[in-house]
Swiss-Prot record:
Function as written in the Swiss-Prot or TrEMBL entry: Catalyzes the formation of 4-diphosphocytidyl-2-C-methyl-D-erythritol from CTP and 2-C-methyl-D-erythritol 4-phosphate (MEP).
Enzyme class of the recorded protein, top EC level: transferase
UniProt superkingdom: Bacteria
Gene behind the chain: ispD
Keyword match Repressor: no
PANTHER family hit by this protein: 2-C-METHYL-D-ERYTHRITOL 4-PHOSPHATE CYTIDYLYLTRANSFERASE, CHLOROPLASTIC
Annotated site residues (Transition state stabilizer) in this chain: 22, 29
This protein's name: 2-C-methyl-D-erythritol 4-phosphate cytidylyltransferase
Highest classification ranks of the organism: Bacteria, Pseudomonadati, Chlamydiota, Chlamydiia, Chlamydiales
GO molecular function, one term: 2-C-methyl-D-erythritol 4-phosphate cytidylyltransferase activity
Family statement drawn from the similarity comment of this UniProt entry: Belongs to the IspD/TarI cytidylyltransferase family. IspD subfamily.
Functional pathway: Isoprenoid biosynthesis; isopentenyl diphosphate biosynthesis via DXP pathway; isopentenyl diphosphate from 1-deoxy-D-xylulose 5-phosphate: step 2/6
NCBIfam families reported in the protein's UniProt record: ispD
Gene3D superfamilies (UniProt xref): Spore Coat Polysaccharide Biosynthesis Protein SpsA, Chain A (3.90.550.10)
Length: 217
């Protein structure tokens, strides 16, 4: 139906529209200083060295476009929800495959992208994950979940552009708020491949996360 086939190039949607309210800073956390430059530029510079990525779309407020001056990127405007921002970025995508990455995650590794893309070519969608190191309890009713059956989801995620578009449209029609991008494939009853991370994954949500990101370099 979707003609899942191999194509060597992907677009990258780099999400940079978040407000960063939980971080408590006076500016969105993706623009906080990290090794002498805004945090998001660390991810962008890593992405520019990844051969599978042929174009990058930054989803950000117009007031922050100047941060990306001199970089070969396109721009799209953020929406109210994550899925609205992703849909906005998709309007600029020129490739049949797309990677989606959070701007508050400073690391995007070439070997993991290669494995993600290879897996997505087989199924239509793939996400980076890691094992759950803790005991997890469901709240209502209270019970202990089997952590060996669970995974922590990270970005980037790779998905066929057509699948992501149709899944987002389905979510909007059914008033479903997506919590990650490969959930769009799940809504269409399509498989999602899980690719386990080879490197530590950091999402900068709180100040201590930024300290940890520095320590990983």
């Amino acid at each position: 139906m979707y003609g899942v086939s191999m194509d060597p190039k992907c677009s990258l949607i780099l999400l940079s529209g978040g407000k960063g309210e939980r971080f408590g800073a006076n500016q969105p956390k993706q623009y906080l200083p990290f090794r002498g430059e805004p945090l998001i530029l660390h991810a962008l510079n890593m992405a520019l060295r990844i051969p599978e990525i042929s174009e990058i779309i930054v989803v950000c407020d117009v007031n922050y476009e100047s941060i990306f001056e001199g970089y070969p990127v396109k721009f799209a405007r953020p929406g109210t929800r994550r899925q609205d921002s992703v849909f906005s970025g998709l309007q600029q995508v020129a490739n049949p495959w797309v990677l989606v990455h959070d701007g508050v995650r400073p690391f995007i590794y070439p070997d993991e992208v290669t494995e993600l893309v290879t897996a997505a070519y087989q199924t239509g969608a793939a996400t980076l994950v890691s094992n759950v190191p803790y005991t997890i309890k469901q709240r209502d009713p209270v019970k202990t979940l089997d952590r060996d059956a669970l995974s922590i989801v990270h970005t980037p995620q790779c998905i066929k552009t057509q699948i992501l578009l149709e899944g987002l449209e389905r979510a909007n029609q059914e008033r479903i708020t997506l919590v990650d991008d490969t959930q769009a494939a799940e809504l269409l009853n399509l498989p999602v491949a899980l690719v386990f991370n080879k490197h530590p994954q950091i999402k900068v949500t709180y100040p201590e996360d930024l300290t940890l990101a520095h320590a990983l370099l």
